[in-house]
């Protein structure tokens, strides 16, 4: 697990020019009176920083260093929990219940605390992906119960989709069929949280 307890509020035209400039500035580490600074050159500039809808590797190389999902891969490629501190799977393998860490926060591009990260943010993220026809939708569209019907317009009520915020720190996801590798999909941006208030403020 990463030794951090915050999530930067990135994506959807969120990062400041200063942060982007630091990412595209040199390729070496340097020190200053303010401490250590690390600069890195990315091979390709991202078209945008929307980690929910973009399927581009350049976007996820950057936002993957700023946003946490329920799981991540360690340096050996092993799947480890990130924002999920515990989880259970029903006997039939269809329902996953995740208990979230209670110390994760959203921060804006100025470093100011914006809000707590809650289970609702994960629901909002998947709804946002469906409503905006994410390039990565194919990864989860046939997996989550009711999501394909919502995306196709057969059902217009997202509450019928199998992703629920049971409470602020409990998320439940119901699948169409058992997928032993399901948790590995939760390392991908399309399953990451997004703050509803922030999205609404951006129109």
Pin down the residues of each PLM region.
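Bacterial Sec-dependent N-terminal signal peptides
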Residues: 1-8
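C-terminal motif of bacterial Sec signal peptides marking the signal peptidase cleavage site
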Residues: 19-22
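Bacterial signal peptide processing site
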Residues: 24-26
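Short, well-ordered beta-strand elements
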Residues: 34-44, 95-99, 122-125, 171-172
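N-terminal lobe/hinge region of extracytoplasmic solute-binding protein
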Residues: 41-91
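Extracytoplasmic/secreted proteins, especially bacterial periplasmic and envelope-associated proteins
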Residues: 61-65, 78, 82, 117, ...
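Aromatic- and charge-enriched surface segment that lines or borders ligand/interaction sites
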Residues: 86-138
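Surface-exposed binding/hinge segments that line
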Residues: 121, 130-197
């Amino acid at each position: 697990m990463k030794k951090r307890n915050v999530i930067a509020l990135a994506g959807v035209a969120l990062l400041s020019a200063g942060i982007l400039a630091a990412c595209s500035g040199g390729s070496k580490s340097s020190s200053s009176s303010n401490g250590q600074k690390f600069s890195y050159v990315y091979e390709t500039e991202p078209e945008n920083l929307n980690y929910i809808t973009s399927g581009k590797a350049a976007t996820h190389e950057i936002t993957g260093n700023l946003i946490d999902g329920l799981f991540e891969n360690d340096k050996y490629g092993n799947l480890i929990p990130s924002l999920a501190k515990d989880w259970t799977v029903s006997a039939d393998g269809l329902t996953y219940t995740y208990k979230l860490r209670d110390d994760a926060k959203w921060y804006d591009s100025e470093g100011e605390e914006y809000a707590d990260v809650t289970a609702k943010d994960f629901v909002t993220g998947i709804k946002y992906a469906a409503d905006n026809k994410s390039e990565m939708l194919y990864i989860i569209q046939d997996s989550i119960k009711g999501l394909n019907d919502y995306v196709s317009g057969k059902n217009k009520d997202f509450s019928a989709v199998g992703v629920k915020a049971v409470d602020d720190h409990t998320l439940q996801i119901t699948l169409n069929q058992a997928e032993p590798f399901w948790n590995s999909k939760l390392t991908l941006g399309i399953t990451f949280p997004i703050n509803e208030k922030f999205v609404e403020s951006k129109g």
